Each structure stands twice: as structure tokens, then as C-alpha cells.
């Protein structure tokens, strides 16, 4: 029966050993204060406060999107923000395509410590367009020749090792060779670190999922 099958599956699953990941790879546990939980996430007024008609959507949702975009511009130090994409990987791919549309070059430089799930999306989107993904260790010496044929560079902050480092050398080379500078940044990290817009990045992407 279905109940017997569920019981057996639960028994099998109970043998799994769940260990804590201290790296995260972009997925970090956070605490949501109860005041935010009650007044924002659990408050139906944000999405039903005006009208259910599709033509006008809802004033609450529009206000929430406006507040979100305003917050992102303040955190990143960049002049504009969109109303979000599907996930971090998709946003990174869209940023790559934005940079590609501004140049006839074919190489795209990627931080070798980028999150693996983001790299997979970049490679999938790059393949049909003939874009070459060039992975570089930004912690070592960076050959200038790599930037000569590149239309953009993407940096992960913090990276897959949990390191948060300024990439002044990378940004200077990108500026010299007119490469679009893209940062994949944790929005919560932007509360404590210098805004990526002030660092010199042209575009910022990240994930608000927790």
C-alpha cells in the first residue's frame, strides 16, 4: 500500500547521515527577525491590499518591487536595478549576454572559484553563441593576454572558498581592455563590504533566496 511504501522510504532515508556544510556555495542559513516575518512575509496586505484584478495587479506588490529595487541600488551603489530574474545562475548568464551584445569579442573571463551551479548555467548559455569561457585563478598572476580577446569578466564575492577579496588588479586590466566588469555578490555581504559599484563594477547580480 501507499502507507507501507512511505514507511519503508522513511526507514531508508533515516540511514542518511546529514552533515553541516560550512562553505555554503551560495546557500547560507540566516535568521529572519520575527518583526520582518510578521509584517512582511506573513502580511497578506502586500499582495491583496488594493485589488485582485490582473490588469492592475496589486498596489502592494508594486510597492514591494519598488522598495526592493531601491534597496538593491543602495546596497550595490549602482544607479538602477531590475525587478529580479529567476536565480543567480540565470542572472549571471543574462549579464554575460549583456556584455556580449556590446562587443564582437568571443572570450568571457570567469573567476575559477565561482559557484559550480552558476558556472554550469554560464557554459550552457555560452555554447550556442560560440562564447569561450576562460577560467582564471584571480589569486595568482593574471596574464594580460587573456583580457585582450575578452568582452567581459565576472567575479564571485565571496567566492566558493568563502573568501572576500578586492580585485583591483582584475578591474584595472578589464578597464584597460574595455571589458564589462560583472560582480556576483551576496546582497547580505553588501551590508558590510564596500558597494560593488564603488569598487568599479558595471553590473552586479546575486541571489536574495535564503
Residue spans for each PLM region:
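N-terminal entrance/gating region of PLP-dependent enzymes' catalytic architecture
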Residues: 1-67
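Electropositive phosphate-/nucleotide-binding environments in soluble metabolic enzymes
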Residues: 2-6, 59-66, 86-89, 116, ...
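Short loop-beta-helix segment that forms the pyridoxal 5′-phosphate
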Residues: 20, 53-57, 61, 73-93
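Glycine- and acidic
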Residues: 51-55, 77-82, 104-109, 154-156
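Acidic-glycine-rich active-site phosphate/pyrophosphate-binding loop
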Residues: 60-73, 197-202
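Conserved PLP-enzyme active-site core in the AAT-like
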Residues: 90-210
Amino acid at each position: 500500500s501507499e502507507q507501507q511504501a512511505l514507511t519503508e522510504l522513511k526507514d531508508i532515508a533515516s540511514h542518511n547521515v546529514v552533515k553541516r556544510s560550512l562553505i555554503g556555495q551560495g546557500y547560507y542559513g540566516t535568521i529572519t527577525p520575527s518583526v520582518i516575518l510578521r509584517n512582511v512575509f506573513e502580511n497578506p496586505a502586500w499582495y491583496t491590499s488594493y485589488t485582485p484584478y490582473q490588469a492592475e495587479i496589486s498596489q502592494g506588490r508594486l510597492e514591494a518591487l519598488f522598495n526592493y529595487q531601491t534597496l538593491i541600488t543602495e546596497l550595490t551603489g549602482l544607479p538602477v536595478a531590475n525587478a529580479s530574474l529567476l536565480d543567480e545562475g540565470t542572472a549571471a548568464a543574462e549579464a554575460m549576454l549583456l556584455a556580449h551584445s556590446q562587443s564582437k569579442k568571443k572570450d568571457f573571463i570567469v573567476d575559477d572559484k565561482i559557484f559550480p551551479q552558476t558556472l554550469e548555467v554560464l557554459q550552457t548559455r555560452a555554447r550556442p553563441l560560440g562564447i569561450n569561457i576562460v577560467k582564471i585563478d584571480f589569486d595568482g598572476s593574471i596574464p594580460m593576454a587573456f583580457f585582450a580577446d575578452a568582452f567581459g569578466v565576472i567575479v564571485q564575492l565571496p567566492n566558493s572558498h568563502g573568501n572576500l577579496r578586492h580585485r583591483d588588479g582584475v578591474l584595472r586590466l578589464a578597464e584597460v581592455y574595455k571589458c564589462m566588469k560583472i560582480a556576483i555578490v551576496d546582497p547580505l555581504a553588501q551590508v558590510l563590504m564596500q558597494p560593488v559599484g564603488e569598487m568599479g563594477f558595471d553590473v552586479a547580480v546575486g541571489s536574495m533566496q535564503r
